[in-house]
């Protein structure tokens, strides 16, 4: 089951976040409409595990529905029906309110493609996704763009395998992904961009719970072109060629290089399409490498980070005169929005 992070439920709200472990509302009837038994009472049902004494922090007051044991089905209570020990309660999910592209933790923005970048401040890029196969190893990056959708590179996916082979990890800083903030959610559907661009959408089997460590990035306006020399950031756990910080999320700042310049003979020599963008140090030394395929290139605009690129390809890794190439997300916003709306 997906690990539910510890999220603060709004005080007294009659709605729940995630599986409702933090629910402290006043619902006191089961789905069948039967009143709940008081947690402190021993009639009609005798019980010793979940009482206000044994679980003083679980909010077991009166006979309100609660989820003291983190049951995946949500809040429950002992019932006043002598023939039914316990039952679940019908509590709606809270509307998740979040601002896309606004981390709760300020990013380091280290000067220096991720080979020569630096270790990120934990959870400062809260839309960063680690894509895993059944083997559990990180093999590609991705970006959370709404509670139920992740954008990644098409070349990361093997369409023969189908969605059940993939899981996304959210809220991680360490590649091992064992922190309490981690949410692990199976993928339910894969959508490859129809014109065969190197971009794909993953629908999650259940929505991510938006927390301080898990926040979507914003999508750009359709067909927006990032100006030359705009400073943007890439993040990932990828191949770092013996450089420092393996296993922790890394970041690097990169200037965008306009296509006209990037396609010059001495750089990428006409290989970059208008639906792609270049970013990198023409001197070499920083770049996103294998293993960060599918990960984000975000640019700060006004007061938020906007996903402008999906890491796609590069010639080698952090080589002089060979900037990284990213899918230009703005080109595909109509397809992204249409797919999210239809499915």
From Swiss-Prot:
Per the record, residues carrying Phosphoserine are: 130, 221
Q: Is-annotated flag, keyword tRNA processing?
A: no
The UniProt record lists the keyword Repeat = yes
This entry's Enzyme Commission designation comes to: 3.4.21.7
Q: Where is the Peptidase S1 domain?
A: 114-341
Chain positions covered by the region annotation Plasmin light chain B: 141-343
Q: Which CDD domains match?
A: KR (cd00108), Tryp_SPc (cd00190)
User: A Pfam family this protein belongs to?
Assistant: Trypsin
Annotated spans, Plasmin heavy chain A = 1-140
Q: Give additional notes from the record.
A: Plasmin is inactivated by alpha-2-antiplasmin immediately after dissociation from the clot.
**Name by which UniProt lists this protein:** Plasminogen
Q: Which species is listed as the source?
A: Ovis aries
């Amino acid at each position: 089951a997906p690990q539910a992070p510890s999220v603060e439920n709004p005080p007294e709200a009659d709605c729940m976040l995630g599986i409702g472990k933090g629910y402290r509302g006043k619902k006191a009837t089961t789905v069948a409409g039967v009143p709940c038994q008081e947690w402190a009472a021993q009639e009609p049902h005798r019980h010793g595990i979940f009482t206000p004494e044994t679980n003083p922090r679980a909010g077991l007051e009166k006979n309100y529905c609660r989820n003291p044991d983190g049951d995946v089905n949500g809040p429950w209570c002992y019932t006043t029906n002598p023939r039914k020990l316990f039952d679940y309660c019908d509590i709606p999910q809270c509307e998740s309110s979040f601002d896309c592209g606004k981390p709760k933790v300020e990013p380091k923005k280290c000067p220096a493609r991720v080979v020569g970048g630096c270790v990120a401040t934990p959870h400062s890029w809260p839309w960063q996704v680690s894509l895993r196969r059944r083997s559990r190893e990180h093999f590609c990056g991705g970006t959370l763009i709404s509670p139920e959708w992740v954008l990644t590179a098409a070349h990361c996916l093997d369409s023969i395998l189908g969605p059940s082979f993939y899981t996304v990890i959210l809220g991680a800083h360490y590649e091992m992904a064992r922190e309490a903030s981690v949410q692990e959610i199976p993928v339910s559907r894969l959508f490859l961009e129809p014109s065969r661009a190197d971009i794909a959408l993953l629908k999650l089997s259940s929505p991510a719970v938006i927390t301080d460590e898990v926040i979507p990035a914003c999508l750009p306006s359709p067909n927006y072109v990032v100006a030359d020399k705009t400073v943007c950031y890439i993040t990932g756990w990828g191949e770092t060629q013996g450089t420092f910080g393996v296993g922790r999320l890394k970041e690097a700042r990169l200037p965008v290089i306009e296509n006209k310049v990037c396609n010059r003979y001495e750089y990428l020599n006409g290989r970059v399409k208008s639906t792609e963008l270049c970013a990198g140090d023409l001197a070499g030394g920083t770049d996103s490498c294998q293993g960060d395929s599918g990960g984000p290139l975000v640019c700060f605009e006004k007061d938020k980070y906007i996903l402008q690129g999906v890491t796609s390809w590069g010639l080698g890794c952090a080589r002089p005169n060979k900037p990284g190439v990213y899918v230009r997300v703005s080109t595909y916003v109509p397809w992204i929005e249409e797919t999210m709306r239809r499915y």
